C-alpha cells in the first residue's frame, strides 16, 4: 500500500529491533479519507474497496508481520493498543485532507473484473445474463399498462447503464 512504509528502529537499552509502519503524507491511491475520518481502503486480494477499518488494520498488520519475519524484528502491530500504533494511525487520518471518491456509482456483477478506478466496494451475487425473462414478463405485463411499463424499464435501464447520477428523476413503487 502506498500510504505507509515499513521501518525498523532499535531500542538502545535492550538492543531489540522493532518493525513498525511510518505513515506518509502523500496523495494515496490505496486509502480514502473523508471528513477527517477513514473512508475506504483498496483490498487488492478481492479487487474491491472496503470501508471496514478492521480489514485495513488486518492488511497493514499482515504486511508488518511479514516484514518483521524477513528482518528478524519484533512487529509493532495496529491490533495491539499497547503499541500505540492504532492511535498514531487515527491521528494520521485526522491530519490528512479529504481524498475520496463516491463508491458504488455503478453496479458490479459477480464475475465482473474490477479495477481500483471503478470505485466498487461490493458485488451483486449474480451475473447479468441475456436470457429471456419469462417471470418478469408475466408479472410486469399484468401489473402495468404499456406506457407505465416503458417508464419503469427506462428507469431500470438507467440504473444498469450507470446513468442515474446524471439523471435527476426517480421512481417510487408502492402498493
Where are these regions (language model features)?
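Intein modules and their embedded homing endonuclease domains
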Residues: 1-119
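P-loop NTPase catalytic core of nucleic-acid-dependent motor ATPases
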Residues: 31-54, 98-175
